[in-house]
Design a protein with these regions (language model features):
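Beta-propeller-forming repeat regions
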Residues: 16-663
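Sec-dependent N-terminal signal peptides
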Residues: 3-13
Length: 663
């Protein structure tokens, strides 16, 4: 039986729309000395492959792979060690390598730099050519049958070759079905995650001896280890192993064997208080580095210093992680950032606050001016005496337990209670809206711990992963969100913790304003901002989106339906396919939008969304399918201007006078 064309296309959805910024646009740069800032590739995720002395420095250089974006292996030259002990590296160079992720890089005693890679059911050995900056294949062999579909490998060297540890799945299967359907239910009626809990374990392939399971159980690390490193922690611990994990634990195995493996029971790497450390973000991989280890997953790279001490549990004790640094770095806002511009420290110039998928709120201090801004690398905003970090936890993500470590925090700031200082209101992965009241001063914010906002005594709740728009209108504070019906909805402040219903916002033709291109995982992901873009005195919406957003309706909305194309066929045939293909199967990427207010601030009504185009009439799409924020701002002079982000944490300030918003 012939399959419908759209079903055939589903099987070949392999390409996506390409990002576009105006020619010459550069990411905002770090204004710290030597441009130092957190080391992060232009990727969602990182895999630290290992280190080697390539350039002859005092400390080793670093090999890092990126994915979730352009996939490549990068080499970072060591240049310094910062005061807090974190290594500092130069800008990366791309290494020619046929393999991008499932590998481990190490240096033999004679100086040769070796890369071992998993290529489906084969193990590939490569050697690094320093002159050509290339990993050249030298050997390829079948993996033993017991090593079935390994996800990562770790290497312990010995005089006879390599002792290899492979990460394998226990075969557990998660919830059935698609998160993009009404039928999706990741939790049962008792609130418990459905499906089997997926765990990983280790199998060893020693230089001498049999291939065998080397961990005590097949239920070692939930969901993913994401990487394995051999590490020398001193006498009696020269050949231990540490793995990463989906949830951010670093998992330690003492190896008693002088060759091969004799692993003890797993232990969670401890902090100096004796409690298990938890990486700041999801999915850290790990690699030993002199003095400790480097870990990275989603987000930037971190260095953990080994203290030389051991916890009562038998785990090694490491210091709290500090950022690995790069010179001449872009400002880094974390993955899927959602920014706002306010004078956070009361010095008369606009700073940047940004939330991200890790769940932090970051403060980028402007040490320049509004016309010529210069920003220092971020510090994390605190509330109630602790860093703000909002994450889904066990049941806070509609896509399931495996998303417990994501937050997708989207902050906005306004003087909510008219006491002269800025407060924070946030949306996040849960769809809830929280307020952080500022009890400090204009120059030194001091936020209370988060409290819910209520409407009619019910927690204010809407679509997940959205940002609230805030404005002062006629002496009252207005708040707009994407509500539970998937519509733009206005609320008015009653008091510090309560709002009243202001009604659904509408288009100028009277229709409601829808948001999502689908249900479940295809819903929400909309970052609203009140801003007078056309300077007519009426507040418009500037909107950050993901690719599955469809404003104002699923049939014609932006960007998904209006800009989406089939990812397979171009030209005339492609245009015909586009007309026949359901919108949810078309591909585009997150696109900043503006919706002009054709009414007044007191009686808002909005025109259909418009895209921003550059002087060559090309649509501005900073990069990424998930979602990022976009706000109007007076930063940069001759405003209004547009501050946008790609999902890899870079921010871009675009001059408004070089942007077009005509239909």
């Amino acid at each position: 039986m012939k399959q419908p064309l759209y079903l055939l296309l589903v099987a070949t959805l392999c390409s996506a729309a390409e990002p576009h910024l105006p020619p010459g646009t550069k990411a905002l740069q770090s204004a710290a000395p030597n441009g130092r800032g957190p080391l992060a590739l232009v990727n969602l995720n990182h895999h630290v492959l290992g280190h080697a002395r390539v350039f002859g420095g005092k400390q080793p250089d670093l090999f890092v792979a990126g994915y979730g974006g352009p996939q490549a292996v990068h080499l970072f030259k060591w240049v310094d060690t910062s005061e807090n002990g974190a290594p500092v590296f130069a800008e990366p160079v791309v290494v020619k390598c046929a393999f991008k992720d499932k590998g481990s890089v190490f240096q033999r005693d004679g100086g040769a730099v070796i890369g071992l890679w998993i290529d489906k059911e084969e193990l590939v050995t490569t050697e690094f050519d320093r002159e050509k900056l290339e990993f050249r294949e030298t050997k390829r062999e079948k993996l033993p049958k017991a090593v079935k579909s390994p996800s990562s490998l770790g290497v312990l060297t010995n005089g006879e070759g390599y002792d290899l540890a492979f990460e394998l799945s226990n075969g557990g299967k998660g919830a059935e079905g698609s998160a993009n359907t009404e039928e999706w239910r990741p939790f049962n009626s008792s609130g418990i995650a459905v499906g089997e809990l997926r765990y990983r374990y280790l199998i060893g392939w020693p230089a001498k001896g049999e291939v065998r399971q080397i961990t005590k159980t097949k239920r070692e690390v939930f969901f993913s280890m994401h990487g394995i490193t051999g590490i020398d922690l001193g006498s009696g611990h020269e050949r231990d192993l540490i793995t990463g994990s989906r949830q951010g634990n670093l998992v330690f195995y003492h190896n008693k064997a002088e060759g091969g493996f004799a692993l003890g029971t797993k232990r969670l790497v401890a902090g100096e208080d004796g409690n298990a450390l938890r990486h700041p973000s999801i999915n850290p991989s790990v690699a030993a580095y002199p003095g400790g280890l480097i870990a990275c997953g989603e987000g930037s790279l971190y260095f953990y210093r080994f203290t030389g001490k051991w916890a009562k549990t038998g785990a090694p004790v490491f210091a709290e992680p500090v950022s690995v640094l790069q010179e001449h770095a872009d400002l880094y806002a974390g993955t899927l950032p959602s920014p706002t511009t306010v004078d956070w420290n009361g010095d008369g110039v606009l700073d940047i606050l940004a939330g991200n998928s890790e769940g932090f709120v970051l403060f980028f201090e402007n040490v320049g001016s509004n016309d010529e801004p210069k920003f220092l690398p971020a510090t994390r905003v605190q509330a109630g005496g602790r860093e703000i970090q909002v994450q889904a936890g066990y049941s806070g993500s509609l896509q399931g337990l495996q998303e417990a470590r994501w937050g997708y925090l989207s902050p906005n700031a306004i003087d909510w209670n008219d006491d002269g200082v800025l407060d924070l209101i946030t949306g996040d992965i849960t769809g809830n809206y929280l307020i952080y009241l500022n009890r400090g001063t204009k120059t030194a914010a001091k936020l209370d711990a988060a409290r819910p906002l209520y409407c009619d005594g019910i927690d204010l709740h809407g679509m997940w992963r959205c940002r609230p728009a805030l404005a002062k209108i006629g002496g009252r504070i207005a708040l707009a969100i994407v509500d539970g019906d998937d519509h733009f909805h206005l609320y008015w402040r009653i008091d510090d913790y309560n709002v009243e219903d202001g009604g659904k916002l509408k288009l100028d033709d009277g229709r409601l304003i829808g948001t999502s291109g689908g249900v479940g995982g295809m819903s929400g992901r909309c970052k609203l901002d009140f801003f007078d873009w056309n300077q007519d005195g009426a507040l418009d919406f500037v909107i950050g989106t993901g690719r599955v957003v469809a404003i104002p309706d699923r049939e014609t909305g932006y960007p998904m339906a209006a800009l989406g194309q089939n990812p397979v066929v171009g030209g005339l045939i492609g245009s015909l396919v586009d007309k026949a293909l359901p919108a949810k199967l078309k591909k585009t990427i997150g696109t900043p939008l503006v919706m002009l207010n054709t009414g007044t601030n007191e009686a808002m009504k909005f025109a259909r969304p418009l895209v921003f185009r550059d002087e060559q009439n090309v649509v501005i799409q900073p990069g990424g399918a998930h979602e990022t924020g976009a706000v109007g701002t007076l930063l940069g002079g001759n405003g209004p201007n547009l501050l946008i982000c790609n999902e890899a944490g870079r921010m871009f300030l675009l001059p408004g006078n070089k942007l077009q918003t005509t239909p």
